[in-house]
Amino acid sequence: AVLQLYPLSARETPKVSLLRGGYPDALARPAGARLWFASYLQTYLERDVRAVTAVKDLATFRRFLALLASRHGQVLNRTDLAAPLGVSVPTITQWISVLETTAQILIVPPFYENLGKRLIKSPKVYLADSGLACHLLGIDSAAELAKSPFAGSLFEGLIASEIVKAQVNAGGRRELYHFRDEQGLEVDFVFPGRNGSLTLVECKAVRTVTPAMAAPMQRLRDAARKQRPKEAAVNMFLVHQAPMVKSRTEAVAPGVRALTWRDFLEAM
């Protein structure tokens, strides 16, 4: 049996970062992280993948990983993944299952609650470790990460991974969803809490936030309140990167707390 074990969380070590992720060996020797990730991928492909499935073409599977990294944070489209690799959609489905079984990816399903809206019903996919995602995308330095068109989706994936690790490490169920409707309203993450509460999270890979960034959460909160008990709280967090100068206030919009991602994890 394959043990589903996630990398270290930011609660477990402050060394966890967007660029390096949470694998202990990559964090222990940052200068050698690139070599370690390359070795890890080779070991993972030759040992773990073969242990759970009869993948015959490891080279194509390796290309699949890189392609999946380029779709990090997007709605999962198996046909879109199958075509450039020249494999079938059932093969992609099997490979996705392998990655999920071995805790290499997170599949974030759409929020299920009926809010009177026509919802996008496809899940989103993230690599479980941001360091591995950066490696697969060829991002090896903070400067490259800052300029990368993937910076936003990588940051979003880091938050997804940290939320799931916090839930699992606390002995709870993994419950993380995304929200997107056909009118274009989108909130990065939604998860239920105690006493029927709901937490909405919007992720921004920026150091300065604005009230407009919180608007989608406020719209979803208003829709949720019409369908939920009045006493059920709806918590909203605008999660961002650490500013150069610490902000004096967390309040960015009515009912919304703007927190750095590390502060958000403490407040969860």
Predicted regions and their residues:
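Alpha-helical residues within the helix-turn-helix
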Residues: 83
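A cross-kingdom feature that marks ATP-driven nucleic-acid transaction machinery
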Residues: 98, 104, 109-268
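Short amphipathic alpha-helical interaction segments
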Residues: 87-101
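Interdomain motor-coupling "hinge/lid" segment immediately C-terminal to the ATP-binding subdomain
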Residues: 1-79, 103-104
